[in-house]
A protein has these predicted regions:
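Sec-dependent N-terminal signal peptides
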Residues: 4-15
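C-terminal motif of bacterial Sec signal peptides marking the signal peptidase cleavage site
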Residues: 16-20
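Cross-family detector of peptidyl-prolyl cis-trans isomerase
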Residues: 21-212
């Protein structure tokens, strides 16, 4: 079913490790540096990590926004960490907020994505399409969301970036991120609904091809 749905992502990567020209290190050593950077970020921010088994008991992750007093991320076996800030699916029914439990992402949905991507190594904002104070005078950076078609079948899951006149994400294209949505983004979708907000720590192997 084709349906327009919305998603907000807060992303953390260590892409600068793999884009920098450092011929003194092997790929395996850079992967180890990335792992250490992720562990340091988790420790420095006092993040509690839970297993996928723990998470799937209720598919909830604690967050300071929800009043829990701490942040909690679920660790996936592929190195992705996820925190669901807002699962989405909220609707207004005659002035009462209700949750649409079946308003999940499905095959052939067109997903409009707003995101902020930061490099955890440098603290730099590397790509975004939301208004940020530093770039408020460059509206072309956040004029359009990133839109992609979500394809889900029995054997594969992938996202294809759309390229219509209202789908042009300026920074995404200028960085050469291409037409494939990073697999690290897609891992969150089965747990979310329309208008969700999720935070992800995405390792290079699950991120953009430019960081692999």
């Amino acid at each position: 079913m084709k349906k327009l749905v919305f998603l907000f992502l807060s992303l953390l990567t260590a892409g600068s490790l793999f884009q920098a020209c450092d011929n003194s290190k092997t790929y395996a050593e850079m992967l180890e540096d990335e792992k250490n950077a992720v562990n340091k970020f988790i420790k420095d921010n006092d993040i509690r990590v839970i297993s996928l088994e723990e998470f799937e008991r209720d598919t909830i992750t604690a967050s300071k926004e929800a009043g829990n007093g701490y942040d909690e991320y679920v660790a996936f076996s592929n190195g992705v960490y996820m925190q669901i800030v807002d699962r989405g699916g909220k609707e207004d029914k005659n002035g009462v907020e209700v949750i649409n439990e079946v308003d999940t992402f499905a095959n052939n949905n067109v997903i409009c994505t707003r995101y902020v991507e930061q490099d955890m190594m440098t603290g730099d904002t590397t790509c975004f399409n939301v208004p940020l104070e530093r770039w408020m005078d460059v509206p072309d950076y956040y004029k359009f969301p990133l839109t992609f078609r979500y394809v889900q079948n029995t054997s594969t899951v992938y996202g294809i970036v759309l390229s219509g006149s209202l789908d042009y994400d300026l920074l995404w294209n200028s960085k050469g991120y291409g037409t494939a949505i990073p697999s690290g983004w897609l891992i969150a979708l089965p747990y979310l609904r329309n208008n969700a907000h999720v935070r992800l720590i995405v390792p290079s192997k699950m991120g953009h091809t430019t960081a692999q």
